[in-house]
């Protein structure tokens, strides 16, 4: 069995060796909760990788959004090239949940667009857990949402070997039960085709490789793996396990039981509604549910099948749904990255889902069992955990209370220290700020300014422009691609100052930034809490000249705590550097690690984009349609490679082109 093996030029330095040793010891001793308090840029991902290598256990890494999950997945793939590093996030490109608004009598049907590539990656993740132990899955919070039963998923797996006595038609019937679809012409993921005694299966977890099973009578003669595009044989296989094409598969016996159970619940609910005089709601519910039952009897599935997941899995009412966590072996470990954001997000999921379903159940659009197709409650989530390491520069009260040990990682491998903090009175703040900006511009460095309101940010941006400073304002209405473009332009030096309200989102750890100015630092609220202030201060921690100026007339509790904590860390870092003769260096490279779309691309790209605009304007309608198809293929390829910013950039370009049709 393969073991986890970190492949890297880095050696643990600074606080890393101690952190790795202590966290490993905690896991081996069976401690349930630990916290890695690691400052920005201290190499937390590398520490996590070394701990995984030490304990050799299947691992789930939880991130609070898709972009961060993709970045972590890329980093772990670099550290573990010989192991299975998988990616599990929501597969919806677009999702409008089913809802009912009683005030206007408006029913909104569920509408969604599923990203086929991400669905493939999800299948790859779950199948890897049943095939091997050297598995790391990087997931977003969508992993606490309902997924099919792991028991049914495993029981319906098709295991084939050469020499096995198995009838071809029997294998076909099994594939159909696993929700594979027969299509002899359009051969793609989740489908199979038959040519005489040859059966070709395209597994749900693959993009480019399929399995060819050759029969001789009732015996499997040969199994080969081949490239779907070229038809070239990759190799012969002595054994192959085909996993179901859907996570919501169930056996025919369970389906029959589920239909009976749905009918019983329907009768009970209809009696309740009629006794309350809700005749319209009762009629609506009966009509919709009977149609779904018919579909389940005839086809084995129906639209919105997930709303009947409790019946399909045979769970009692109110019991927790099956999720990705149930697919892991009992001894798995979990890292919760940026836990100060991720934990509150996990807490909020259940209530949001329940509030939306209340109206659907009350007005006869769904049976009460629809409540059981839901994310886990926070208490259920806690029960499913085995051993957890919270990872954050600013752990929240929950993490600190739960953890048996808090391991600090304060020393950065680059020798960089936390920035110096200055508090300046509000009177004359703008003139003072302009003076500080000019000092940075002379050194070819950049400045981030955070304000509390949109109005203040807009006024400040206009004022700075009027005095000749090259400044841009980044607000919440800016889409992902434009946001990446702004960050890239800041790094390229097309402007020097970026003004924003919330500068804590991913992608803003920029080495060129040597000054962070916090206006209204003494106005208490979530943007000026201790956690937010420490995170904002960290934005200046990648430059050797890093400095933070807080503009305030008084020092609040949150400010004092943030200043004290930063000074404490700074003292430890400076002492370590002096003791070991380390001279801090601004991060020069690592642009790719910050965020893919901010890479300093040469000016050639811009020339190309302007030429492309001219060409598109002269294209015929048919040529634009063909160009859109080409771009869609490129977009899918980038999605496979986890280059989501590039894929999103192409998606936005496709939207613009479709407007021209």
Curated annotation (Swiss-Prot):
<dbReference type="Pfam" id="PF12344">
    <property type="entry name" value="UvrB"/>
</dbReference>
<comment type="subunit">
    <text>Forms a heterotetramer with UvrA during the search for lesions. Interacts with UvrC in an incision complex.</text>
</comment>
<dbReference type="GO" id="GO:0009381">
    <property type="term" value="F:excinuclease ABC activity"/>
</dbReference>
<keyword id="KW-0267">Excision nuclease</keyword>
<dbReference type="InterPro" id="IPR027417">
    <property type="entry name" value="P-loop_NTPase"/>
</dbReference>
<keyword id="KW-0228">DNA excision</keyword>
<keyword id="KW-0742">SOS response</keyword>
<keyword id="KW-0963">Cytoplasm</keyword>
<dbReference type="InterPro" id="IPR041471">
    <property type="entry name" value="UvrB_inter"/>
</dbReference>
<dbReference type="GO" id="GO:0016887">
    <property type="term" value="F:ATP hydrolysis activity"/>
</dbReference>
<dbReference type="GO" id="GO:0009380">
    <property type="term" value="C:excinuclease repair complex"/>
</dbReference>
<keyword id="KW-0547">Nucleotide-binding</keyword>
<dbReference type="InterPro" id="IPR001650">
    <property type="entry name" value="Helicase_C-like"/>
</dbReference>
<dbReference type="GO" id="GO:0009432">
    <property type="term" value="P:SOS response"/>
</dbReference>
<dbReference type="Pfam" id="PF02151">
    <property type="entry name" value="UVR"/>
</dbReference>
<comment type="similarity">
    <text>Belongs to the UvrB family.</text>
</comment>
<dbReference type="GO" id="GO:0003677">
    <property type="term" value="F:DNA binding"/>
</dbReference>
<dbReference type="Pfam" id="PF17757">
    <property type="entry name" value="UvrB_inter"/>
</dbReference>
<dbReference type="InterPro" id="IPR014001">
    <property type="entry name" value="Helicase_ATP-bd"/>
</dbReference>
<keyword id="KW-0227">DNA damage</keyword>
<feature type="domain" description="Helicase C-terminal">
    <location>
        <begin position="429"/>
        <end position="591"/>
    </location>
</feature>
<keyword id="KW-0067">ATP-binding</keyword>
<keyword id="KW-0234">DNA repair</keyword>
<feature type="short sequence motif" description="Beta-hairpin">
    <location>
        <begin position="91"/>
        <end position="114"/>
    </location>
</feature>
<dbReference type="GO" id="GO:0005737">
    <property type="term" value="C:cytoplasm"/>
</dbReference>
<feature type="domain" description="Helicase ATP-binding">
    <location>
        <begin position="25"/>
        <end position="178"/>
    </location>
</feature>
<dbReference type="InterPro" id="IPR004807">
    <property type="entry name" value="UvrB"/>
</dbReference>
<dbReference type="InterPro" id="IPR006935">
    <property type="entry name" value="Helicase/UvrB_N"/>
</dbReference>
<dbReference type="GO" id="GO:0006289">
    <property type="term" value="P:nucleotide-excision repair"/>
</dbReference>
<comment type="function">
    <text>The UvrABC repair system catalyzes the recognition and processing of DNA lesions. A damage recognition complex composed of 2 UvrA and 2 UvrB subunits scans DNA for abnormalities. Upon binding of the UvrA(2)B(2) complex to a putative damaged site, the DNA wraps around one UvrB monomer. DNA wrap is dependent on ATP binding by UvrB and probably causes local melting of the DNA helix, facilitating insertion of UvrB beta-hairpin between the DNA strands. Then UvrB probes one DNA strand for the presence of a lesion.</text>
</comment>
<dbReference type="InterPro" id="IPR036876">
    <property type="entry name" value="UVR_dom_sf"/>
</dbReference>
<feature type="binding site">
    <location>
        <begin position="38"/>
        <end position="45"/>
    </location>
    <ligand>
        <name>ATP</name>
    </ligand>
</feature>
<dbReference type="GO" id="GO:0005524">
    <property type="term" value="F:ATP binding"/>
</dbReference>
<protein>
    <recommendedName>
        <fullName>UvrABC system protein B</fullName>
    </recommendedName>
</protein>
<dbReference type="GO" id="GO:0004386">
    <property type="term" value="F:helicase activity"/>
</dbReference>
<keyword id="KW-0378">Hydrolase</keyword>
<dbReference type="InterPro" id="IPR001943">
    <property type="entry name" value="UVR_dom"/>
</dbReference>
<feature type="domain" description="UVR">
    <location>
        <begin position="625"/>
        <end position="660"/>
    </location>
</feature>
<dbReference type="Pfam" id="PF04851">
    <property type="entry name" value="ResIII"/>
</dbReference>
<dbReference type="InterPro" id="IPR024759">
    <property type="entry name" value="UvrB_YAD/RRR_dom"/>
</dbReference>
<keyword id="KW-0347">Helicase</keyword>
<dbReference type="Pfam" id="PF00271">
    <property type="entry name" value="Helicase_C"/>
</dbReference>
């Amino acid at each position: 069995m393969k073991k986890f093996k970190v492949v890297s030029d880095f050696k643990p330095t600074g606080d890393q060796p101690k952190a790795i040793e202590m966290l490993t010891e905690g896991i081996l001793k069976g401690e349930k909760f630990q916290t890695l308090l690691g400052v920005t840029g201290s190499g937390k991902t590398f520490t996590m990788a070394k701990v995984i290598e030490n304990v050799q256990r299947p691992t789930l890494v939880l991130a609070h959004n898709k972009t961060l999950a993709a970045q972590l997945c890329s980093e772990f793939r670099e550290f573990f090239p010989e192991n299975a590093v998988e990616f599990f996030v929501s597969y919806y490109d677009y999702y409008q949940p089913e809802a009912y608004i009683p005030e206007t009598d408006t029913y909104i049907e569920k509408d969604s667009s599923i990203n086929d590539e991400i669905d493939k990656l999800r299948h790859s993740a779950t199948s890897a857990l049943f095939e091997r132990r050297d598995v790391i899955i990087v997931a977003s919070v969508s992993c606490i949402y309902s997924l099919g039963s792991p028991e049914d998923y495993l029981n319906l797996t098709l295991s084939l070997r050469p020499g096995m006595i198995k009838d071809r038609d029997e294998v076909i019937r099994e594939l159909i039960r696993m929700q594979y679809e027969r299509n002899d012409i359009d051969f793609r993921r989740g489908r199979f085709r038959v040519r005489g005694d040859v059966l070709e299966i395209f597994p749900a977890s693959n993009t480019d490789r399929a399995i060819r099973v050759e029969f001789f009578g009732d015996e499997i003669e040969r199994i080969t793996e081949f490239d779907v595009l070229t038809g070239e044989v990759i190799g012969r296989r002595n054994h192959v396990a085909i996993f179901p094409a859907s996570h919501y598969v169930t056996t025919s016996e369970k389906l029959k039981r589920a239909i009976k159970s749905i009918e019983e619940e329907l009768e009970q609910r209809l009696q309740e509604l009629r006794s309350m005089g809700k005749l319209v709601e009762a009629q609506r519910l009966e009509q919709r549910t009977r149609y779904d039952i018919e579909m389940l009897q005839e086809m084995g599935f129906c639209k919105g099948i997930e709303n009947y997941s409790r019946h399909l899995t045979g769970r009692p009412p109110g019991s927790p749904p099956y999720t990705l966590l149930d697919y892991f072996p009992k001894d798995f470990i979990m890292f919760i990255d940026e836990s100060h954001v991720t934990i509150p997000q996990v807490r909020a999921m259940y209530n949001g889902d329940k509030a939306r379903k209340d109206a659907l159940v009350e007005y006869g659009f769904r049976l009460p069992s629809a409540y059981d197709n839901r994310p886990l409650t926070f208490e259920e989530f806690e029960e499913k955990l085995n051993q957890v390491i919270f990872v954050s520069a600013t752990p929240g009260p929950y993490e600190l209370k739960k953890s048996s040990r808090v391991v600090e990682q304060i020393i950065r491998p680059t020798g960089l220290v936390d920035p110096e903090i200055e508090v300046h009175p509000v009177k004359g703040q703008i003139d003072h700020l302009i003076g500080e900006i000019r000092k940075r511009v002379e050194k070819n460095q950049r400045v981030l300014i955070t304000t509390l309101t949109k109005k203040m940010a807009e006024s400040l941006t206009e004022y700075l422009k009027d005095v000749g400073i090259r400044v841009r304002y980044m607000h919440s209405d800016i889409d992902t691609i434009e946001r990446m473009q702004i960050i890239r332009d800041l790094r390229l030096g097309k402007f020097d100052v970026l003004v924003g309200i919330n500068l804590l989102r991913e992608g803003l750890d920029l080495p060129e930034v040597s000054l962070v100015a916090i206006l209204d630092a003494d106005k208490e609220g979530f943007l000026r809490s201790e956690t937010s202030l420490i995170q904002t201060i960290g934005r200046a921690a990648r430059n050797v000249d890093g400095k933070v100026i807080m503009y305030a007339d008084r020092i609040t509790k949150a400010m004092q705590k943030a200043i004290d904590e930063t000074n404490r860390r700074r003292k430890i870092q400076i002492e370590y550097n002096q003791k070991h003769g380390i001279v801090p260096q601004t991060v020069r490279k690592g642009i790719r690690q910050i965020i893919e779309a901010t890479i300093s691309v040469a000016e050639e790209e811009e020339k190309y984009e302007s030429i492309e605009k001219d060409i598109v304007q002269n294209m015929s309608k048919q040529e634009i349609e063909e160009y859109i198809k080409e771009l869609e293929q490129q977009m899918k390829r980038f999605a496979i490679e986890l280059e989501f910013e590039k894929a999103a950039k192409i998606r936005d370009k496709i939207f613009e082109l479709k407007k021209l049709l």
